[in-house]
Amino acid sequence: MIAGSMVALVTPMDAQGGLDWDSLSKLVDFHLQEGTNAIVAVGTTGESATLSVAEHIEVIRRVVDQVNGRIPVIAGTGANSTSEAVELTENAKTAGADACLLVTPYYNKPTQEGLYLHFKHIAEAVAIPQILYNVPGRTVCDMLPDTVERLSKVPNIIGIKEATGDLKRGREVLDRVSTDFLVYSGDDPTAVELMLMGGKGNISVTANVAPRAMSELCAAAMAGDAETARAINERLMPLHRALFLEANPIPVKWALHEMGLMGNGIRLPLTWLSQSYQEPLRQAMRQTGVLA
C-alpha cells in the first residue's frame, strides 16, 4: 500500500528554465534520507503543465532510476484530453513509475458522466495503479463523491487525492468507498484531520522543505496519535500558509533555493517569488526550523 508522506516534488530548473538534473538528484537523495514515504513526480508542483512530453518522461525515468525501488514513485499523468492522458500514463508505466496521479480535466469543464468515462477509459487502457486527483480550486472542475464512488469500483483505480481542503467532503468520500480504496489529502493544513478520519496519507507541498516533520506527522496521524500529529501540524502551520503566498510552486521553489537545494529557475507563465513575499516566507521557514 502506498501511504504516508508523499512529496509533491518540484522540478528543479536553471535560470533559463532548463531542467537541472543535478539538483533533481540532490532532492531525491534529500527525501530518501529524511523519511519521505513516496515521491510524486511531474504533478502540479512539478510544473507538469509546462514540461514537454520528452521532459516529462525523462524526469520520471531519472527519479525511478535513482529511487531504485526504495520508496514508490507516482507520476502525474493527468490531462484535459483523454487520449493525451492515456499516452502520458503509458509513458509513465514504461518509465517505471509505481502508480499514476491523474488530475481532473481542466478548462473544458466535463460533466460528472464525462469525468467517469474519462477516468474509466484511462484505467482500462493502461494497467498501472491510478490515483484520481480532485483540486477544483485549480481546475474549475469538481469531481463529486457520487462519481468517486463509481470510479472506486473500476479496476486499476486505487485511490484519490482529495485537495479541496473540505473535511466534510473528505468524510463523505471515506464513507462512500471501500476501506481498500486509498483516500489521500492534498491540502497540508487539513491533512492531519483527514488522516485521523481514515485517510492513508498526504500528497504534500510542505514536505518539499520539511520532509522529516511531515513524515512524522503522517505516521502519528495514521497510528491514531492525534495529540502528536496535531502538535506537529500546529508547528508547521506558518509554513503551510506561507507556501501559498503566491501560486504553487512559486513559493516552494524559492524556499528550496533559499535552503541551497536548487537554483532559481521557474518557467513562464510562472515567475520567481515577488520581493514583498520573500521575507514573510523566510520568517515562516525560520519559525518552523527549516532555516537557521
Swiss-Prot record:
List the GO biological process terms: diaminopimelate biosynthetic process; lysine biosynthetic process via diaminopimelate
Gene3D superfamilies registered for this protein in UniProt:
Aldolase class I
What are the EC numbers?
4.3.3.7
Does the keyword section mention Cell inner membrane? no
Q: Provide a Gene Ontology MF annotation, just one.
A: 4-hydroxy-tetrahydrodipicolinate synthase activity
| Disulfide bridge positions per record | none
Q: Which residues cross the membrane?
A: none
> Which positions are annotated as binding pyruvate?
45, 203
Report the catalytic activity.
L-aspartate 4-semialdehyde + pyruvate = (2S,4S)-4-hydroxy-2,3,4,5-tetrahydrodipicolinate + H2O + H(+)
Q: Where is this site: Part of a proton relay during catalysis?
A: 44, 107
Q: SMART domains recorded for this chain?
A: DHDPS
What GO cellular component entries does it have?
cytosol
Principal localization reads: cytoplasm
What does the UniProt entry say about where the protein is found?
Answer: Cytoplasm
Q: Which residues form the active site?
A: 133, 161
Q: In which pathway does it act?
A: Amino-acid biosynthesis; L-lysine biosynthesis via DAP pathway; (S)-tetrahydrodipicolinate from L-aspartate: step 3/4
Keywords on record: Amino-acid biosynthesis, Cytoplasm, Diaminopimelate biosynthesis, Lyase, Lysine biosynthesis, Schiff base
What role is this protein assigned?
Answer: Catalyzes the condensation of (S)-aspartate-beta-semialdehyde [(S)-ASA] and pyruvate to 4-hydroxy-tetrahydrodipicolinate (HTPA).
Binding partners and assembly = Homodimer.
State the family named in the UniProt similarity comment for this chain: Belongs to the DapA family.
**Which NCBIfam families would you find in this protein's record?**
dapA
Identification of the protein by name: 4-hydroxy-tetrahydrodipicolinate synthase
Q: What are the leading ranks of the lineage?
A: Bacteria, Pseudomonadati, Pseudomonadota, Gammaproteobacteria, Pseudomonadales
